[in-house]
Amino acid sequence: MSHASPDAARSRIVLASNNPGKLREFAALFSTAGIDIVPQGELGVSEADEPHATFVENALAKARHASRATGLPAVADDSGLCVPALLGAPGVYSARYAQRAGREKSDAANNAYLVEQLREVADRRAYYYCVLALVRHADDPEPLIAEGRWAGEIVDAPRGAHGFGYDPHFFVPALGATAAELDPAAKNAASHRALALKALVARLGEIR
């Protein structure tokens, strides 16, 4: 009679992203629940379209796409930076903020465009927002949904070498640092994605 190795009992969930920063955050938190995160690129899955106007619709579309392509449970996030003074922009277009204005698609271009848009704006309040969607299968009628919000403000000069996206310009008064100045452990304890992930991980028993 054969005996399964301890690793054989570990579940696998496809991450509907190939972003290295996201992969590190997801892998660290899901590992505490005995779950291995596999980026969709390793399984030959292409990026899904994100045509929707809300974070939750985009997250669900990405999760269903990855699950349909692999036959495995899948998790996706749709996250963005929201600036109330800019009517919630960049919002769902955070990754393509500068590109939508005819500029290149890059973190540097996005950050430069954001600072430019806020040049004459006194209210620099902002928040990172994250919605996570986990589907057991592609047509799951009851996906697990979790969300997280991280409050801060936008600063003109970039600070810090960690993180990605808008992190160098996202200052968190409660921590006295930008998101990019936080080491990964500190960010994983405080960020919007961390809050959403912790809420989702707490419910993982529902998919066993």
From Swiss-Prot:
Family: Belongs to the HAM1 NTPase family.
Cofactor remark: Binds 1 Mg(2+) ion per subunit.
Listed GO MF terms: dITP diphosphatase activity; ITP diphosphatase activity; metal ion binding; nucleotide binding; ribonucleoside triphosphate phosphatase activity; XTP diphosphatase activity
Residues that bind substrate: 17-22, 79, 164-167, 187, 192-193
Enzyme Commission no: 3.6.1.66
Protein name (record): dITP/XTP pyrophosphatase
Native organism taxonomy: Bacteria, Pseudomonadati, Pseudomonadota, Betaproteobacteria, Burkholderiales
Domain of life: Bacteria
GO biological process, one term: nucleotide metabolic process
UniProt entry keywords in alphabetical sequence: Hydrolase, Magnesium, Metal-binding, Nucleotide metabolism, Nucleotide-binding
Pfam families membership: Ham1p_like
Cofactor(s) the record lists: Mg(2+)
Organism: Burkholderia pseudomallei (strain K96243)
One CC-aspect GO term: cytosol
Record's subunit section: Homodimer.
Catalytic residues (positions): 78
